[in-house]
């Protein structure tokens, strides 16, 4: 796993396999209330640590929804339509994407989604 590289070059994060997975499962199960039957979608690339965090959701018995492409293509509503169509219960994305949606007046109804 590597750091994001936000403030410089990405750096390798040294860890042991079991401890990281156990902690991520704890975060998802206890802090996010993710469990069997839930569907998690966090728009991320596999190079960002959120991919590892999302993949750890499989340890809770939940399902993952992934997107191969841009969240704003063909329009900013595409990500929200995907979440609704796939029955996503837990959704995550970047603040920049949320700001872009706000700036363009995109206001999806997400009654059944935990952000």
Predicted regions and their residues:
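Conserved S/T- and glycine-rich ATP-binding loop of Class I adenylate-forming
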Residues: 3-6, 40, 91
């Amino acid at each position: 796993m590597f750091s994001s590289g936000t403030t410089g070059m990405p750096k390798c994060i040294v860890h042991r396999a079991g401890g990281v997975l156990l902690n991520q499962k704890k975060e998802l199960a206890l802090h996010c209330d993710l469990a069997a039957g839930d569907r998690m979608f966090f728009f991320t690339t596999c190079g960002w640590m959120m991919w590892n965090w999302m993949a750890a959701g499989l340890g809770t018995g939940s399902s993952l929804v992934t997107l191969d492409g841009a969240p704003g293509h063909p329009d900013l509503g595409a990500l929200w339509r995907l979440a609704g169509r796939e029955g996503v219960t837990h959704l995550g994305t970047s603040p920049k994407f949320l700001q872009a949606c706000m700036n363009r007046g995109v206001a999806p109804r997400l009654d059944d989604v935990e952000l």
